[in-house]
Structures are given as C-alpha cells and as structure tokens.
C-alpha cells in the first residue's frame, strides 16, 4: 500500500506505467532522475523503477505524464537519454548475475525511459561496517566481496562500466551475500558533467573528476581497490582529486601490518 504523496513533478502513486507497473512512493532523486517503489501487476512482485528525468534538462511534465525538456536542452536530453537506454538495455540482457542487483526491464514511454530492477535487499555495506567494532580480516573481505568482483567482471565483459563502486552501493543481504547496485550513466558519475553529478569521494577514480579524461575498466578497478582498502583498514580513502595534488593516503600495510 502506498501513500499518494509523491512530490510535485513526479509520477503520482497508483499511476500505471506501460500497463504493467503500479507506481508507488518516490524514494530517491538524483541528477539522472527519480526512483520509485512499484509493483509488477503481472506477478505482484515489488520492484524499483528509475525514471530518466534529469533536473538540469527537464522543466515540466504534461498532464499525461510526458517529460518536457527545457528550451535549448532538447538535443542533449535526447542523447543522454540514449545513454541511459543503452546502459539498462545491456543490463537487462546481462540478466541475473552473481554479485549484481538484477535489472528486469526497460520501458520507453512518456518521452523518456524507465529502468525496472529488483529492490535492494538488506543493508548497505557502509551500515554493515559501521556496526562492526573492527575492520574485516583479509579472509572475511574476500569471502564477502568476491561476488561483487565477479559482478563487475561480468559487466566489463559486456562492455559496461559501473563507475560508482562504494560502501553506499554495495548491499549485504540477510543471507550475508553482497550485491552491487547504483547503476548510472557516465554523466552522473563525472564531476562538472551535463548532469548534476553524484560522486563517491574516496572511491571515485581520478579520471571521474575531469570531463576531458577517459574512463575505462581501470575506473572500476580503482573503485574496487578503494572498497577493499576501506573494509581492511577501517579508513575511508583520501579522495582521488586530492591525492593528485598531494597523496597523503597511507598504504594499507602501514595501517595494519597484517595486510
């Protein structure tokens, strides 16, 4: 049961998307758009839906729910929407994969696109670590995060990059398994891009702080390395943009000689 109190400019609760998904509460807003709880009426399963409606490019919505780009932003909206569609279409093709939150469907309607995925289960890795009194051992870290590494590897084989690996985008399920969520297009994970960016300082790679630089598999490898640094040392890594100017990040083995 949902409360019909979604913010103005978002889809109203109980509206039906593509004849299949009942929109529920708005649960998050970022530079790419709006995320909703929802129900797949074909099987009564709960899902999460992300609507591509970037605040920097979209000004309004018609009475029928169609997204209206800002004047002068029409072409940019269309091209970045294509990035969103390409990403999530590939993730739908990838299907259920160890260590990844599953993307179930991609819907194109209302002059925009909607990514449908399974809900995030359990708690974030950040909450999990905060509840511990000490860092993980190397054995614990490998056992916990190995599925995430496999998931990132599967994305790379598809030609996809995650760009947002962090304790906030890894979820620990009730069974103790780790899953990576937080998929996003290049613009959301690059500073000073055409979108209002969402960066994870300490985990974002150096090239994510400059629109003129290229990312690659190494971007996610940096994020994984930073993630392991955090779980093994208990310390948040120094942001990459600051490390470029003056690298004050102590090597992990100097924080803990057992590493």
Where are these regions (language model features)?
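Protein kinase glycine-rich loop
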Residues: 24-30, 35
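AlphaC helix of the eukaryotic protein kinase fold
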Residues: 64-93
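Activation-segment/catalytic-loop signature of the eukaryotic protein kinase fold
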Residues: 105-106
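Conserved short submotifs of the Hanks-type protein kinase catalytic core
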Residues: 110-124
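AlphaC helix of the protein kinase catalytic domain
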Residues: 125-136
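Activation segment signature within eukaryotic-like protein kinase domains
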Residues: 144-145
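Protein kinase catalytic-loop region centered on the HRD/HxD motif
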Residues: 148-160
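C-terminal lobe helix-coil module of Hanks-type protein kinase domains
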Residues: 202-259
């Amino acid at each position: 049961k949902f409360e019909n109190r979604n913010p103005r400019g978002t889809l109203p609760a109980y509206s039906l998307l593509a004849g299949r998904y009942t929109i529920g509460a708005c649960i998050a807003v970022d530079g790419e758009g709006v995320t909703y709880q929802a129900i797949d009426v074909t099987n009564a399963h709960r899902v999460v839906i992300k609507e591509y409606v970037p605040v920097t490019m979209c000004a309004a919505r018609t009475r029928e729910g169609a997204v209206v780009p800002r004047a002068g932003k029409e072409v940019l909206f269309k091209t970045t929407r294509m990035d969103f569609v390409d990403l999530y279409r590939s993730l739908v093709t990838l299907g259920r994969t160890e260590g990844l939150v599953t993307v179930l469907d991609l819907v194109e309607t209302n002059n925009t696109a909607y990514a449908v995925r399974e809900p995030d289960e359990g708690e974030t890795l950040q909450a999990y670590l905060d509840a511990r009194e000490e860092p993980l051992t190397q054995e614990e870290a490998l056992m916990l995060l190995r599925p995430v590494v496999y998931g990132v590897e599967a994305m790379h084989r598809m030609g996809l990059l995650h760009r947002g690996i962090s304790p906030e985008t890894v979820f620990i399920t009730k069974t103790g398994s780790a899953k990576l969520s937080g998929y996003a297009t290049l613009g959301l994970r690059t500073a000073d891009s055409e979108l209002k960016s969402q960066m994870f300082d300490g985990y974002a790679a150096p090239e994510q702080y400059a629109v003129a630089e290229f990312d690659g598999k190494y971007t996610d490898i940096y994020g994984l390395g930073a993630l392991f640094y955090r779980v093994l040392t208990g310390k948040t890594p120094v942001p990459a943009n600051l490390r470029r100017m003056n690298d004050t990040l102590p090597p992990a083995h100097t924080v803990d000689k057992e590493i």
